[in-house]
Amino acid sequence: MSKSTGSARVHAWLELVRWHKPSGRLILLIPAGWSLWLTPNAPPAPLLVGLIVLGGLAVSAAGCIANDLWDRRIDPLVERTRNRPLADGRVGLQEAMALLLLALAVALAVLLTLMQGLPASGRGLSLLLALAALPPVLLYPSAKRWFGYPQLVLAVCWGFAVLIPWAAATGSLAGGWPLALVWLATLLWTFGFDTVYAMADRDDDRSIGVRSSALSLGRQAPLAVAVSYGLAAAALGLAAALQGGGWIIWPLWLLAAFGMQREAALLRRPDLPRSAYGRHFGRQVQLGGLLLLALVLGQLP
């Protein structure tokens, strides 16, 4: 194998797990950060943060590979996805399966490391949550074939990015309202931004015969996104208030909440180019990161 061929192969692997587009990885890690900085034990230990980041990257990689395995016959028919490595043949089926197993092995190694510092009850809970997360993560890509709102399935997947870090930090899910609210905020935010992501593919999805919340909601999709973002910001703000964060949280929270509504309002413009939906997704990473920054600063003495 020549150096150029090897480099192209590695680049194809990175595309398969979407590491060439960091916004998609960050948008999973941000709710994990919300969770860690809202636990009673906040701020979290640096080692715990590092393990959660590594585990999140591994699970995200596994989810992306599973998505492309499910969609390898559909992706060539969709403008946005036709150049993905499995769709255009740069990565073979067996190669993708091997990478999927590797990603799951890394996620398992992270889980076992996290469990070492927990009491017996906490270890059992962490293992149960990890096992419960696996089916929706691997089956989510199939939801568009049988469910009109597959973005709800992704939201459930994202919810585990809140539950697992909380359990790893505290050894339980006895978080009361703060935990319930940050979990709900994550589900709502995820449904909103993934609905926008699906809006870019409406014409292709309609012609292929697959489903999405963008198609199911029709002209009401921008309103649904705005409501989802508004409720998500409210839930996260209430969770922060219940945990007693510092005053610095609130100006940043207001800025992020306003930004989310502004972005949702822009979706009402007629004849938006496909690129506008990608920019919206990137801005949600920024706004979600701003909310995380607010929580981090709120923990400072």
Where are these regions (language model features)?
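Transmembrane helix-loop junctions in multipass membrane proteins, especially transporters and channels
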Residues: 40-44, 72, 112-120, 145-149, ...
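Membrane-embedded alpha-helical segments that form the functional core of polytopic membrane enzymes
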Residues: 29-70, 80, 104-112, 123-138, ...
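Interhelical loop and helix-boundary elements at the membrane-water interface
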Residues: 2-26, 73-100, 137-157, 202-227, ...
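Membrane-water interface of transmembrane alpha-helices
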Residues: 63-73, 191-202, 259-268
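Hydrophobic alpha-helical transmembrane segments in multi-pass integral membrane proteins
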Residues: 163-172, 289-301
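Multi-pass membrane catalytic core of lipid/isoprenoid biosynthesis enzymes
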Residues: 29, 50-54, 72-130, 207-247, ...
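Hydrophobic residues within membrane-embedded alpha-helical segments of Major Facilitator Superfamily
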Residues: 27, 57-59, 99, 103-106, ...
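Intramembrane alpha-helical segments
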Residues: 14-15, 62, 84-181, 263-268
